[in-house]
Amino acid sequence: MVRRTGWGGSRRQRGRWGDLGPSSVPLLPMALPLPASPCRGTGGRRISVFSLSPAPRTRSCSSSVFPPASGSPCLVIQEAGASQTPHNVLPTPTTPSTQAHPTMIHTSASPSWGSHSTPPLASATPPPSCPRPQDHPGLRMGPLIPEQDYERLEDCDPEGSQDSPIHGEDHQPLLHVPEGLRGSWHHIQNLDSFFTKIYSYHQRNGFACILLEDVFQLGQFIFIVTFTTFLLRCVDYNVLFNNQPKNHTRRGPLHSKVTLSDAILPSAQCAEKIHDSPLLVFLLVLAAGFWLFQLLRSVCNLFSYWDIQVFYREALHIPPEELSSVPWAEVQSRLLELQRSGGLCVQPRPLTELDVHHRILRYTNYQVALANKGLLPARCPLPWGSSAAFLSRGLALNVDLLLFRGPFSLFRGGWELPEAYKRSDLRGVLANRWRRTVLLLAAVNLALSPLVLAWQVLHAFYSHVELLRREPGAFGARRWSRLARLQLRHFNELPHELRARLGRAYRPAAAFLRAAEPPAPLRALLARQLVFFSGALFAALLVLTIYDEDVLAVEHVLTTMTALGVTATVARSFIPEEQCQGRSSQLLLQAALAHMHYLPEEPGATGARASSYWQMAQLLQYRAVSLLEELLSPLLTPLFLLFWFRPRALEIIDFFHHFTVDVAGVGDICSFALMDVKRHGHPQWLSEGQTEASLSQRAEDGKTELSLMRFSLAHPQWQPPGHSSKFLGHLRGRVQQDAAAWGAPSTRSPPTPGVLSDCTSPLPEAFLANLLVNPRPPQRDLSPTAPCPAAATASLLASISRMVQDPSCVSPGGTGGQKLTQLPELVSAEMSLHAIYLHQLHQQQQQELWGEASASSPSRPWSSPSQPGSPDEEKPSWSSDGSSPASSPRQQWGTQRAQNLFPKGFQENTDTQKEPLTGPLH
């Protein structure tokens, strides 16, 4: 694991934003009291620590103490890297330095716990002539890239230093805080929480909407509890159902009618019935305690969001009334510009779009990587050989508590993974401890399951019964599952970007499911007959009620009409739609794939058509199935914790050990989130020759390559690192090469004439949909399985890339606002074509590999788990030294793995529990 030292400081300090995250540097000046003798420039001006010049660097693992120049109040401590050319975060003066040579004080290097570790911070002793005061608790600095020199500036103000020139002052720009930008954001101690709340404030539409949303949620909880108690203890159902005479009589012609007031018990009698039930009183006390906890948390969050509103208004110059018209990209751009101008002093410097995404999506990127490696979601084998994925809201909350935010989790809600998880000799001890934590959490879930189940039933009853009465067909509609939002998500993709992409993919994906559904003529025949008979009975009762409304007073007539309507609606959903018959399911799948970008493999599915259908069906599931999963979640969550996650404790510990890196200025993040093609690329996704990843280190389904492409298109100002930039250049070159091979525009027109050539398409998304669903037949012999060949896609991709680079080509004659609105749509269309292009190249490469394998060994089955077809299919190892036999669950998955998930019902697999304890836990 690559160990990168971040900006140091105390890691357990707390402030407004919680735990002290890495690289939190308070702005100077600030409202908090500063240590004595601060650094000052000429005229008593306070200067930023970033305006000071760096000291010379050394390659030895020692610390260098630089005596300051006359009047220089700063002490510099330096650490040298061992393997990379050092870079410095501070600006270098253009003229030679006049500082005295440093005095080297050698220290012994600390022991290394792995080949990728770096020594801890070197110690230094200040000169006797310049005593070093204690650092301010908020001042935290460090390197920007791994294994490089860094400098820490200490306050040391000798007498008369305020009027002395600072070294490099004549050559370096002074970064200072403008007088009008002084607020609570100048002393940020948890940048993860700060950036996350900035994003959440924008997505939740400002402080007023956040306040009302929290108030309504608290009020909804009170309503559900009080109304349910009222229905249980304060209503006389014998009077309401007219089974006994009412409590009092009323004069007049309507004296025999039962009113609601007749069935409601008096308040004293209602309170007495509540007191007579100790269980109900206990549940009400629990509900009151939970409500008070939610109220306290909401109040604390509202104070934080009020500060965020002030930050938006004063620092970003976005008033609340204009927030809805400002996209997130503009907010992020202003945030980065504010940091570059010195108004927000955080590290790394300069702040990039990727740094912001790393902090907002620190835990989410881990979850996406866990899903990519097969550890999420939980799966259960089905009797017919396939498997069912399960990831309810309750299970996702428990996973979050186990791994990230719980008191006994790996991260414990912070930005740093403890050092013990980065040591390979403690993996067995940590796995056993995590198993005990899972067992404890499963026991708590099992104990609370009756209460949670009752709450789920009540909430579903109050939320969906009206919809069932008014529109029963809504439960037959499909919606993206929680599994889809996890498996189809790119690394570093924000929630609103994912929602927009899946929203564009919904219609073609739903059409594909209707077109590719396996034929079931008998089921359709029975459904038609059921619709006819239930509809006939419903029509007869409806006519009778129209003729005489007293028919509704007959017992169970209204209930019968409701049941008949629901039955007809449900049965009609099993009848195939005529408009979907005859449409090519392959074209619809390609149109959906253009926006989904992924179609993860379904374990145990056989046949290409059946596999694609069941994959999509689990991603885009019925609303009724989703509701049923949430209702059963309190009962199934403890079982999956015990029999899915607990046996995989060692694999999960190994995952965090091998796929965690410490990025300077950011903290510990998932290594997949760096989108490093060299480390996590896949040779079958155009990374051949550019990646050094072993089989267990590769991201499946081209996740690294597609995530890198999406992020680079969405953030054109972002500069990718060397290997990633090389991959993007190679991809652009391959696109140009295939586009040239397809033919020049003068001799071969695009599949949709006039859309790309004259730039008259008002909506790029409409163009893309027309292209994918109605492609022009290719003019050369191509595989019938590729309706839009790679060369044709490359030609279109090259054309639309020119449109993105030339905004004047978008909607000629339109206003500037219209052009800016259409540019993101063009970028989305370009990314869709990139996804199709990469999938086509991947398919071609797989076909070539299959052809070579069948030619060399025609008698050997390619996908046999016991006989791998290529060296790459050998069983991978998660450990670089070969000490761990655990392999990637995604690679292990097969028929044998599926059969051993829950042998004999729900029995625990103890294979991973036999790992010996190799070292004590410190």
Swiss-Prot record:
Bias (Low complexity): 115-124, 854-870, 877-889
Residues in compartment: Cytoplasmic: 1-206, 297-437, 459-523, 572-624, 646-922
Keyword Cell wall biogenesis/degradation set for record: no
BP GO annotations: autophagosome assembly; bone morphogenesis; programmed necrotic cell death
Keyword annotations: Autophagy, Lipid transport, Membrane, Transmembrane, Transmembrane helix, Transport
Coarse class of the protein's main subcellular location: membrane
Membrane topology recorded in Swiss-Prot or TrEMBL: Multi-pass membrane protein
Residue span of motif Tyrosine-based sorting signal: 150-153
Region called Disordered, residue ranges: 1-22, 85-144, 848-922
Pfam family, one: ATG9
Lumenal side: 228-275, 545-550
Stretches within the membrane that do not traverse it: 438-458, 625-645
One GO CC term, this protein: recycling endosome membrane
Catalytic activity: a 1,2-diacyl-sn-glycero-3-phosphocholine(in) = a 1,2-diacyl-sn-glycero-3-phosphocholine(out); a 1,2-diacyl-sn-glycero-3-phospho-L-serine(in) = a 1,2-diacyl-sn-glycero-3-phospho-L-serine(out); a 1,2-diacyl-sn-glycero-3-phosphoethanolamine(in) = a 1,2-diacyl-sn-glycero-3-phosphoethanolamine(out)
Assembly, per entry: Homotrimer; forms a homotrimer with a central pore that forms a path between the two membrane leaflets.
Biological role stated in the UniProt entry: Phospholipid scramblase involved in autophagy by mediating autophagosomal membrane expansion. Cycles between the preautophagosomal structure/phagophore assembly site (PAS) and the cytoplasmic vesicle pool and supplies membrane for the growing autophagosome. Lipid scramblase activity plays a key role in preautophagosomal structure/phagophore assembly by distributing the phospholipids that arrive through ATG2 (ATG2A or ATG2B) from the cytoplasmic to the luminal leaflet of the bilayer, thereby driving autophagosomal membrane expansion.
Similarity section: Belongs to the ATG9 family.
Domain writeup: Forms a homotrimer with a solvated central pore, which is connected laterally to the cytosol through the cavity within each protomer. Acts as a lipid scramblase that uses its central pore to function: the central pore opens laterally to accommodate lipid headgroups, thereby enabling lipid flipping and redistribution of lipids added to the outer leaflet of ATG9B-containing vesicles, thereby enabling growth into autophagosomes.
Name of the protein in question: Autophagy-related protein 9B
Provenance organism: Mus musculus
Species lineage: Eukaryota, Metazoa, Chordata, Craniata, Vertebrata
Gene name for this UniProt entry: Atg9b
